[in-house]
């Protein structure tokens, strides 16, 4: 029977080898490949212009003024989490409300009313569902082309632009289906708003 004394050195050697192999070499190679081939994705898909960071293209930002495009409802809780200086931090979480609950129905109704008031020219058009519901993450950066089109008249008027100019920006910020067949077309709200502000080129 092998003693513990004879087994431990071998076990320790195997542990060190696999730690070096998978903890250092493997992760280093994968990180290097990612930085070489997909540097933007590997570094968080941050939108940066002239050295200033404006956000991540994969995380939604909340816009409420008439001159910008509105995204999906965001679930934000800053009541509990603060940094060392007491500044509130933003955290998002999926909604736990049932679609059949009265509270959820009230939230949807309030959102519809707000959109109707902001976009009176679209009074006869049904409000796209993604403008009045939360996403699973609570921070979805995209909306449907229909939801973007619903806001064109308001955005054009607020920015003294033509509706076709706004549609051109939306088209430039629209992602197609994956491989042309999977998923749906989506519009990145942050990119649209940065183009409206003249920060990103059209």
Model-derived features with residue positions:
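Extracytoplasmic/periplasmic C-terminal soluble domains
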Residues: 149-202
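Short, Lys/Arg-rich, polar N-terminal cytosolic tail immediately upstream
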Residues: 1-2
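Flexible, solvent-exposed loop/hinge segments and secondary-structure transition points
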Residues: 14, 23, 30-151, 158, ...
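Solvent-exposed alpha-helical segments within well-ordered globular domains of core cellular machineries
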Residues: 6, 106, 110-113, 164, ...
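Aromatic-residue-lined binding/catalytic grooves and analogous aromatic/hydrophobic interfacial grooves
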Residues: 5-22
């Amino acid at each position: 029977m092998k003693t513990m004394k004879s087994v431990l050195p071998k076990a320790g050697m195997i542990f060190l080898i696999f730690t070096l192999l998978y903890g250092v070499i493997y992760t280093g190679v994968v990180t290097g490949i990612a930085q070489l081939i997909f540097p933007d994705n590997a570094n968080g898909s941050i939108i940066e212009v002239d050295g200033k960071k404006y956000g991540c293209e994969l995380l939604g930002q909340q816009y409420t003024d008439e001159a910008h495009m509105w995204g999906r409802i965001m679930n934000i809780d800053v009541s509990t989490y603060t940094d060392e200086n007491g500044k509130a931090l933003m955290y998002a979480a999926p909604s736990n409300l049932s679609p059949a609950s009265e509270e959820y129905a009230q939230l949807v109704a309030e959102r519809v009313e707000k959109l109707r008031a902001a976009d009176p020219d679209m009074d006869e058009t049904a409000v796209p569902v993604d403008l009045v519901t939360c996403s699973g993450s609570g921070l979805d950066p995209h909306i449907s082309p229909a939801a973007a089109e619903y806001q064109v008249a308001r955005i054009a008027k607020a920015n003294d632009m033509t509706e076709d100019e706004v549609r051109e920006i939306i088209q430039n910020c629209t992602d197609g289906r994956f491989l042309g067949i999977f998923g749906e077309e989506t519009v990145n709200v942050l990119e649209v708003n940065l183009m409206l502000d003249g920060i990103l080129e059209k």
